[in-house]
Every structure is written in structure tokens, then in C-alpha cells.
A protein has these predicted regions:
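S-adenosylmethionine
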Residues: 1-47, 62-84, 94-166
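Class I SAM-dependent methyltransferase core
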Residues: 91
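A short, charged helix-loop
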Residues: 50-63
Length: 166
């Protein structure tokens, strides 16, 4: 089986996850991509899109941004965002939901619109964010329109589209 992908699309975390389950024959890295191959296993059930638990009890999934743990920029933002947010807001490009969970630790947020273009990340975020105040949107943040005026926006850019930072 040959696995090929862009580094910005999460191929490195996918290959890292594969190494936990099978012996990788070889890995080739060129420009912004990587390719790995391995012998076809007898049982392919291990390779289904199954979320994994990380530090803090969060779930992530191979292929989504920062699937191995919370990235340093998000940790820094989380320290500040929960202090002054109130009213209705949005988490644009929320990934698997870390910043939203941290923001929702305050009771002064009445409603949070969680917008994510990556369906795998959105599905994992639904598992991580168990809060009635959140509405989930599978949408490109460049095209999403807020249903009403927002009091705040949470973002940790850049976002990636077709391998380019936006």
C-alpha cells in the first residue's frame, strides 16, 4: 500500500500513526510532500478513521492539524482568550476544538459558532466540545456568514487551502 500526501494536509501525522500499527517499508520526502509504503496487512480495520486520545482528555485524528497534541500558539492563545470573552462569538477554523473548550470555561459566553472546513476535524471537535452553547458549521471560513453580529472571534491562523497558507 502506498500513502502519499502534502505535509500541510497532515501526511506526517498519518505516517506516524501507521508506524504504530505496521512496519513501514520506506518513506520518501520531496518538497512539500511525503510518500510511504508498506506491505498490505491481513486486517485493515486498524486504518479506519478512529479518533485517538491525547493530553487533557481531548480526541484528535490522524490527518487533522496538530493531531499529536496542542500546538504552542494555541496554548498561548488559550491563556488569554478565556479572560474577557462574553456574548456571542465564533471560532473560525476551530480544528478539533481546543480553543473553544478553553473559551467556554467562562460562563459569560452565551453562544459560540464553531466553523471548520475539515470534516474530520469537525467531527472530532463535536466529541471534544460538549456544550449546549455551541453550534457547529462544516464550512469554509472565507464563505461562512455569521447569523448575527458577533461580540468576538477566536482564530489561530494561518489556515491552509490547497497547500497554501491563507
Amino acid at each position: 500500500i502506498i500513502v502519499d500526501g502534502n505535509k500541510t494536509s497532515g501526511i506526517e501525522s498519518i505516517i506516524r500513526d501507521l508506524k504504530k500499527h505496521t512496519k513501514i517499508t520506506n518513506v520518501v520526502s520531496k518538497a512539500h510532500g511525503k510518500m510511504a509504503w508498506f506491505e498490505t496487512p491481513t486486517n485493515l480495520d486498524l486504518y479506519k478513521d478512529i479518533p485517538t486520545k491525547i493530553e487533557g482528555g481531548f480526541e484528535t485524528q490522524a490527518g487533522v492539524f496538530s493531531s499529536d497534541g496542542v500546538d504552542p500558539a494555541s496554548k498561548l492563545l488559550a491563556h488569554f482568550i478565556s479572560q474577557d470573552l462574553s456574548g456571542t462569538g465564533a471560532d473560525l477554523g476551530g480544528g478539533w476544538g481546543y480553543l473553544s473548550v478553553k473559551a467556554l470555561e467562562t460562563n459569560s459566553i452565551s453562544e459560540l459558532h464553531f466553523v471548520e472546513a475539515d470534516l474530520s476535524a469537525l467531527n472530532v471537535a463535536r466529541n471534544n466540545i460538549n456544550d449546549q452553547r455551541v453550534k457547529f458549521y462544516w464550512y469554509d471560513v472565507l464563505k461562512w456568514e455569521a447569523p448575527k453580529l458577533l461580540d468576538f472571534i477566536i482564530m489561530n491562523p494561518p489556515f491552509h487551502y490547497l497547500g497554501r497558507a491563507m
